[in-house]
Amino acid sequence: MMKATFYNKRLLCYIDDTDFTDYQGIGADPMYLRYDSVYGIVQNHIAEEYRDFLARPFFEDGLIYWYVAEWIETPVQLSELDSSKKEHYEQIKEETLKQYANALSQLNADEYNILSSALKYINDDFIYCYDDKVVLVAWGM
C-alpha cells in the first residue's frame, strides 16, 4: 500500500472502488480522479471554513484513500455519534450543505455539473466529524 503525501492533510480512511456502482464523473473519469477540477470550483465559490468538506482522494490499485485536514479531535462517523454530539455536527453539516447549495445556484453550467455530481450522494456513514467540521468521503459515488 503506497500512501500519498498532501500538505496539511492526513489519511482518514480508504475504500475499495468496487464497493460502489453509480460513479459520477467528468468524461470517462470518475469524480475521484478529477479532484482538482472539483476543488477549483470549491476554492472559487465556497467560504474558506467550508472548503474542507470534500475529502481529497488518492486512487491506487483499486483502493481510494481519503485525506482530510489535520485533526486534533479523532474523527468519528456522523452516524456513530452520541445524541448530543450528533445534534451539534448535524447543524454543522446543514450549514455546510447550505453553503454548497448556495454556490450551486450561482455557477455556470459546466461548474454546476461538476459540483452537483460530486454532491449527488451524501450519506451520514461517509461523513466524518472532528474539530467542529464535517468532511465527506466517497463523494461522487
Where do the model's predicted regions map?
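Cytosolic/nucleoplasmic/matrix-facing N-terminal domains/tails
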Residues: 1-141
